[in-house]
C-alpha cells in the first residue's frame, strides 16, 4: 500500500502556486454590424479613439472616423470583401504611422508608405505619424528664400519662396501638373528633397510622370506617393498627409523640401464619399462641414522653420481642378483662402498657344518680392504692370481704328514680352537665363525683332551668353544681383547677338 506523504504534496502545491504566472491580456473588441462601400459600422468598441487603427478578422485595417453613442463608423484601407457581418474587430491602440527617412528617396510608395515600384523593401526603421501638429508661430520664420521653379513667368511675376503654400489652379488639361513637374526638375542643383503626391489619378498618368522624372534625373531626390483612381477612397484621403509626413522628416533635419499635392479636388471628393457613406450630414455641394479643416490642417504643415529649429522648410504646391474656370466654387475658394497665393491657368490662353498658360492678371503671390533674388527684383519689377497695361490696351485696340505711335509701340512691346514668357515643357531655365531675357524684353531690345522670331532669338541669346559671356552667368549666379559689370556684359551680348541674328 502506497503511503501518502502530506509534506511532499504540500511542497508540490507550493511550487505550482509559485510558478503560476497569470498574464491577462485586455483587448478592446467589437463586432461588425454592417460593411460595404469601403466603410463598416462596429458595435462594442467603447474605448476607441478618433483616428485609431482597427484590425479586422481577415487582416484588413480600418480607421475609426465616426464615434457615435452606440457604434463606431470606420473606413477601410482595403476592399473589405472578406469582412462579414458579425466578424470581430480589434482596436490596436495605435494611430496611423508611415515609414520616413533617406531610404524612401527615389521610391514610389502607396498612401501607407508601402513600396509599389517592384524594387524590394524599404530599409528604414524610422516612422512618423500621418497626422502631426503644424509648427506654431514661434517655430516659424518669415519666407525669405526663393524656391526657383525655372518658369520665367512664375519666378518673375508670381515668385514662390521656401516655406510658402502656392496654389496651382485651373481647368483640366491646362498644364497644372507640367508646372509642378518642371519645378521638381529645376531643384536638381538646389539640394531640395521633393515629394510628389498623386491623388486619384490614372496609374498610366502617374507612370508617365515617373518616367519624365527618371529621364531628367529627378528621381534621385524625389519620393512619389501614389493613391491611384482604383485605390480605396480612404487611401486617396490619406495620401496627402503621408506625403507631408515624409517631407516633415527632412524639414526638421534642416533641409529644404517641396511637396506637390496633385490634386486636392480629388482628395476632397474621396473625403465627401467617405463622409456620406458614414451618414455625416452634407453641406454645400454635398461636402461635409469639416472639408475646410482637412485642407487647412494639411497646408498649415508647410513652413519655413526658425534658425533655432534648423531653418528647414516645406514648400507646398497644392493643385486644384476647376470646372469651366469657376474659381468661386466651394473647394477652390477654400484652398485659395488657405494658401499664400495662386497661379491661375487659363484654358483660353492654353488653346491660343500661350504655354505655360498663366493668367498674370489674377495670379498672385502674397509673399511677393521677399521670395525673389535681387537680380530678378531689379529686372522684373515692372513686368506684371507692363503685361496688365498691354492686356488692357489690346482689348481697347480691337475697337479703335487708328492708334497713336506711343500706343502702337506699347502694344508691340507687350506682344514681344508675351512671347518671351512662352516656355516649352520640361525645360526650366536658370536664374541668369530668366534675368537676361526679361531684361532684353523690358528694355526694348526685342522691339525690332519680328514677333514670330522672338522665341528663337531668346533661345539663341541664352546659348550665346553661355558660350561667349559666361562671366555674366557666374556673376548673377554667385552674387544673386545684376551688378554694373553684369549689366554691361549683358548689353554687349545682346548687341553682338542681334548683329549675328541679322537685325
UniProtKB/Swiss-Prot annotation:
Site (Required for activity): 363
GO terms for cellular component: plasma membrane-derived thylakoid membrane; proton-transporting ATP synthase complex
Pfam family, one: ATP-synt_ab
Taxonomic source organism: Rippkaea orientalis (strain PCC 8801 / RF-1) (Cyanothece sp. (strain PCC 8801))
Name of this chain's protein: ATP synthase subunit alpha
Catalytic activity entry: ATP + H2O + 4 H(+)(in) = ADP + phosphate + 5 H(+)(out)
Family membership noted in the UniProt record: Belongs to the ATPase alpha/beta chains family.
Function, in words: Produces ATP from ADP in the presence of a proton gradient across the membrane. The alpha chain is a regulatory subunit.
Primary location: membrane
Amino acid at each position: 500500500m502506497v503511503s501518502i506523504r502530506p509534506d511532499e504534496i504540500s511542497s508540490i502545491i507550493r511550487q505550482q502556486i509559485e510558478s503560476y504566472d497569470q498574464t491577462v491580456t485586455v483587448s478592446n473588441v467589437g463586432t461588425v454590424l454592417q460593411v460595404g462601400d469601403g466603410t463598416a459600422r462596429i458595435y462594442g468598441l467603447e474605448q476607441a479613439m478618433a483616428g485609431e487603427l482597427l484590425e479586422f478578422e481577415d487582416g484588413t485595417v480600418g480607421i475609426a472616423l465616426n464615434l457615435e453613442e452606440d457604434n463606431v463608423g470606420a473606413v477601410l484601407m482595403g476592399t473589405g470583401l472578406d469582412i462579414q457581418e458579425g466578424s470581430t474587430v480589434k482596436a490596436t491602440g495605435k494611430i496611423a504611422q508611415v515609414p520616413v527617412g533617406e531610404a524612401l528617396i527615389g521610391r514610389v510608395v502607396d498612401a501607407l508608405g508601402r513600396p509599389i515600384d517592384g524594387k524590394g523593401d524599404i530599409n528604414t526603421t524610422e516612422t512618423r505619424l500621418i497626422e502631426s501638429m503644424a509648427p506654431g508661430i514661434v517655430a516659424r520664420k518669415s519666407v525669405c528664400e526663393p524656391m526657383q521653379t525655372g518658369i520665367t513667368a512664375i519666378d518673375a511675376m508670381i515668385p514662390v519662396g521656401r516655406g510658402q503654400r502656392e496654389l496651382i489652379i485651373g481647368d483640366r488639361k491646362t498644364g497644372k501638373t507640367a508646372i509642378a513637374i518642371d519645378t521638381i526638375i529645376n531643384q536638381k542643383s538646389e539640394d531640395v528633397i521633393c515629394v510628389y503626391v498623386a491623388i486619384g489619378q490614372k496609374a498610366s498618368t502617374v507612370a508617365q510622370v515617373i518616367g519624365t522624372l527618371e529621364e531628367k534625373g529627378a528621381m534621385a531626390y524625389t519620393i512619389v506617393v501614389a493613391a491611384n483612381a482604383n485605390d480605396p477612397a480612404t487611401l486617396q484621403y490619406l495620401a496627402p498627409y503621408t506625403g507631408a509626413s515624409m517631407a516633415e522628416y527632412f524639414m526638421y533635419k534642416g533641409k529644404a523640401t517641396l511637396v506637390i499635392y496633385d490634386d486636392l479636388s480629388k482628395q476632397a471628393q474621396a473625403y465627401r464619399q467617405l463622409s456620406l457613406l458614414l451618414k455625416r450630414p452634407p453641406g454645400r455641394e454635398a461636402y461635409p462641414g469639416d472639408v475646410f479643416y482637412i485642407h487647412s490642417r494639411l497646408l498649415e504643415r508647410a513652413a519655413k522653420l526658425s534658425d533655432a529649429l534648423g531653418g528647414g522648410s516645406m514648400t507646398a504646391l497644392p493643385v486644384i481642378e476647376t470646372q469651366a474656370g469657376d474659381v468661386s466654387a466651394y473647394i477652390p475658394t477654400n484652398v485659395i483662402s488657405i494658401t499664400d497665393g495662386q497661379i491661375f491657368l487659363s484654358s483660353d490662353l492654353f488653346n491660343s498657344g500661350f504655354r505655360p498658360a498663366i493668367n498674370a492678371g489674377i495670379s498672385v503671390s502674397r509673399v511677393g518680392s521677399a521670395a525673389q533674388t535681387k537680380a530678378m527684383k531689379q529686372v522684373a519689377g515692372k513686368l506684371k504692370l507692363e503685361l496688365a497695361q498691354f492686356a488692357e490696351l489690346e482689348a481697347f485696340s480691337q475697337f479703335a481704328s487708328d492708334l497713336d505711335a506711343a500706343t502702337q509701340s506699347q502694344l508691340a512691346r507687350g506682344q514681344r514680352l508675351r512671347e518671351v514668357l512662352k516656355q516649352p515643357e520640361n525645360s526650366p531655365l536658370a536664374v541668369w537665363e530668366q534675368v537676361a531675357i526679361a531684361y532684353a524684353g523690358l528694355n526694348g531690345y526685342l522691339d525690332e525683332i519680328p514677333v514670330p522670331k522672338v522665341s528663337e532669338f531668346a533661345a539663341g541669346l541664352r546659348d550665346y551668353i553661355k558660350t561667349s559671356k559666361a562671366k555674366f552667368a557666374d556673376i548673377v549666379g554667385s552674387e544673386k544681383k545684376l551688378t554694373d559689370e553684369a549689366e554691361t556684359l549683358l548689353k554687349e551680348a545682346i548687341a553682338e547677338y542681334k548683329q549675328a541674328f541679322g537685325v
